[in-house]
């Protein structure tokens, strides 16, 4: 990854809020950087209030967007919550923070695994 890629990745830093205030999924995401490392934390929506997911290390990925020739960086963060694993890809697309979530259930609940995509804006 080049220095320009890392610089562009700084645009991912900060606290991001879901554009859909009625989401039943992820309500916010925080991306942080310490040295050469990245971390991602999520807050989910629960019946009894916010559910804070553990902060995890993130792996930087090159994100070569075909639309408009964008070249940015994305992050891969995997959350293991015991009963489920969520592989999360976060990136910016034309100024909109996008989370793509691949959820695999690890328990015997019979729930279907799923894919979800949500959109976020930077907290002012």
What are these regions (language model features)?
Residues 10, 17-87:
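Central antiparallel beta-sheet cores of small beta-barrel/beta-sandwich binding domains
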Residues 2-6, 28, 64-124:
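Beta-sheet ligand-binding and adhesion/scaffold domains
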């Amino acid at each position: 990854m080049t220095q320009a890629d890392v610089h562009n990745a700084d645009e991912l830093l900060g606290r991001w809020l879901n554009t859909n205030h009625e989401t039943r999924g992820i309500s916010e995401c925080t991306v942080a950087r310490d040295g050469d490392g990245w971390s991602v934390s999520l807050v989910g929506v629960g019946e009894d209030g916010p559910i804070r997911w553990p902060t995890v290390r993130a792996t930087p990925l090159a994100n070569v967007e075909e639309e408009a020739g964008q070249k940015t960086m994305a992050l891969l963060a995997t959350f293991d919550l015991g009963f489920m694993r969520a592989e999360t890809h976060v990136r910016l697309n034309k100024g909109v923070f996008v989370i793509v979530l691949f959820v695999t259930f690890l328990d015997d609940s019979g729930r279907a695994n799923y894919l979800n995509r949500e959109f976020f804006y930077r907290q002012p």
